Amino acid sequence: MTKKLMVGKVAVGGGAPVSIQSMCNTKTDDVAATVAQIHALEDAGCEIIRVAVPDEDAAKAVDKIKEQIAIPLIADIHFNYKLALMCAERGIDALRINPGNIGGEEKVKAVADICRQKNIPIRIGVNGGSLEKELRAKYGGVTAEALVESAMGHVRLLNRFDFDDICISV
């Protein structure tokens, strides 16, 4: 059995029904376009929505978007842990990160700390593009085993920082 997490008001894992999730393909800082797309996806049955947060403008749009939508919002963070911190301060419902590409352990700890304080779950997303070079070499490329080992290493890192509201996406 998996652990039940709350992404906003939607239960994920732990025997909860499978939730329908999608991701916007708009520029997140184009609030009007992003909100319009979220409303269309919600009308089609989407229960949780994810947006890319590649820069500060996108992070600053999070609270404006949340004011206008009814479903939980996940911020997809790459490379800059400060964007995760900004989104957490702006009321994001969950974060999607790859701890291996947002900086060193102190940066991961900062994200884990704010997420623990604000009850924000973290989705660990691992894919072939983010797979560590050492694991590619160990397994001879991108393999299921390499992806699982990477994800579990990230889980252990977050656990070291007393964080366990984790969803894994491989």
Q: Language-model segments: what does each one mean?
A:
Residues 2-51, 55-75, 79-170:
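Alpha/beta enzyme core
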